[in-house]
Curated annotation (Swiss-Prot):
<dbReference type="InterPro" id="IPR020781">
    <property type="entry name" value="ATPase_OSCP/d_CS"/>
</dbReference>
<keyword id="KW-0139">CF(1)</keyword>
<keyword id="KW-0066">ATP synthesis</keyword>
<dbReference type="InterPro" id="IPR026015">
    <property type="entry name" value="ATP_synth_OSCP/delta_N_sf"/>
</dbReference>
<keyword id="KW-1003">Cell membrane</keyword>
<comment type="similarity">
    <text>Belongs to the ATPase delta chain family.</text>
</comment>
<dbReference type="GO" id="GO:0045259">
    <property type="term" value="C:proton-transporting ATP synthase complex"/>
</dbReference>
<comment type="function">
    <text>This protein is part of the stalk that links CF(0) to CF(1). It either transmits conformational changes from CF(0) to CF(1) or is implicated in proton conduction.</text>
</comment>
<keyword id="KW-0813">Transport</keyword>
<comment type="function">
    <text>F(1)F(0) ATP synthase produces ATP from ADP in the presence of a proton or sodium gradient. F-type ATPases consist of two structural domains, F(1) containing the extramembraneous catalytic core and F(0) containing the membrane proton channel, linked together by a central stalk and a peripheral stalk. During catalysis, ATP synthesis in the catalytic domain of F(1) is coupled via a rotary mechanism of the central stalk subunits to proton translocation.</text>
</comment>
<comment type="subunit">
    <text>F-type ATPases have 2 components, F(1) - the catalytic core - and F(0) - the membrane proton channel. F(1) has five subunits: alpha(3), beta(3), gamma(1), delta(1), epsilon(1). F(0) has three main subunits: a(1), b(2) and c(10-14). The alpha and beta chains form an alternating ring which encloses part of the gamma chain. F(1) is attached to F(0) by a central stalk formed by the gamma and epsilon chains, while a peripheral stalk is formed by the delta and b chains.</text>
</comment>
<dbReference type="Pfam" id="PF00213">
    <property type="entry name" value="OSCP"/>
</dbReference>
<keyword id="KW-0997">Cell inner membrane</keyword>
<keyword id="KW-0406">Ion transport</keyword>
<keyword id="KW-0472">Membrane</keyword>
<protein>
    <recommendedName>
        <fullName>ATP synthase subunit delta</fullName>
    </recommendedName>
</protein>
<dbReference type="GO" id="GO:0046933">
    <property type="term" value="F:proton-transporting ATP synthase activity, rotational mechanism"/>
</dbReference>
Amino acid sequence: MELVVIAKPYANAIFELAQQDKSYLQWKMVLDAGAQLLIDEQMCKFIAFPNVLKQDKLSVIKELLKSILARELSGHEVTFIGILLNNNRINALPSIATLFESLINTTNDAKMFNVISAYQLSELEKKQIVRDLTNQYNKVVNIDAVIDKDLVGGVIIKDGDKVIDMSIKARVNELELRLSKTH
């Protein structure tokens, strides 16, 4: 069975739960972190190993997520991971994360930003931008990163017609304008 088909009821259930207390961001972070764990080949082997009890697998995953998220998992989050393990559906976690994000994007509780940079942003830089924008707007934030080598450095963040220009090119243009006014 295709993972998307398996993932859909789980994503819908988590979305309904997140709607109740507006915990979209917390769930998105847990699902994304869980999906990241499953990229690791050793982690996949550990989860697939039949001699390890599911409770032990849950404990390991819980500790790893706690480390990644820098917080304890909620009871609902632990229960959800446990259900995935017990139903042998933990491998659907990346698809669940993707579907959950799609559900969030269809609500008014998400914001999309275009981020233009002079170079390819690292995952850490993208996460920092998302974290900063999330804190500023108090909404789930998604970014679409684009490269424009003319910027030299820095970033431009666009939200519709609103622009936050933190590029070196903008600073040089501003300095040039100031210098031309003084002469």
